[in-house]
Design a protein with these regions (language model features):
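Enzymes that bind and transform nitrogen-containing heteroaromatic metabolites
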Residues: 1-194
């Protein structure tokens, strides 16, 4: 089984979106360089960001998101983002009316079921958990192995927190084993202390 990694771009003060679910400049680093990050050529980053991000993306076998993220992205029109093979959606509701049953999206109830399904789908590859409320719940349940943050130099002041609104016991992370500076971003990777 692959590692379970919590990830998002995040403001310096710990937010993944503002109060209106807008990311503001959190993804500007994805268009601030000259090295294409994906086949579309729309994402261009610095060489250091490419060397960190592309291998990570290539290792992801499944991503877990909450129904809220699924809804505000319109389910990415049935195509998982960044070339990911499968998306597991944590929800108490069924798939949307008219949703293509062949789309590689899996709707499950509860975080434990979501992690189990994602690990089954990913095999030995990574399971990525989107930061926010679902990510915070998975961390609180002790199911996260690593925390990755792409810290962007902006202060939101309020909004949607990286670790969500979950009131969980304190979790100690190890010292970062990766610290990489890109254009408009600082990439950090923390193993979760067990």
């Amino acid at each position: 089984m692959g590692k379970v990694v919590m990830y998002s771009s995040v403001s310096v003060d710990g937010f993944v979106a503002d109060e209106n679910d807008q990311p503001g400049p959190l993804f500007d680093w994805l268009v601030s360089g000259d090295v294409p990050l994906d086949e579309s050529g729309g994402l261009k980053v610095s060489q250091t960001s490419y060397d960190y991000t592309r291998p990570y993306w290539d290792q992801i076998g499944a991503t877990i998101v909450g129904r809220h993220v699924f809804d505000i992205t319109d389910g990415w029109d049935g195509k998982p983002p960044s070339g990911i093979d499968h998306v597991v959606v944590v929800t108490h509701r069924p798939a949307p009316e008219g949703w293509d049953p062949e789309a590689p999206f899996h709707f499950v109830d509860g975080i434990e079921a979501a992690v189990a399904k994602a690990q089954e789908l990913a095999g030995d590859r990574l399971v990525e958990v989107g930061a926010g409320d679902v990510g915070g719940q998975v961390l609180a349940a002790g199911l996260i192995d690593e925390v990755r943050m792409d810290v962007v130099p902006v202060v939101f002041g309020s909004g949607k927190r990286y670790f969500g609104s979950v009131h969980a016991p304190q979790h100690l992370l190890e010292d970062p084993d990766v610290v990489i500076q890109g254009n408009r971003v600082l990439h950090l990777r923390y193993p979760v202390r067990r």
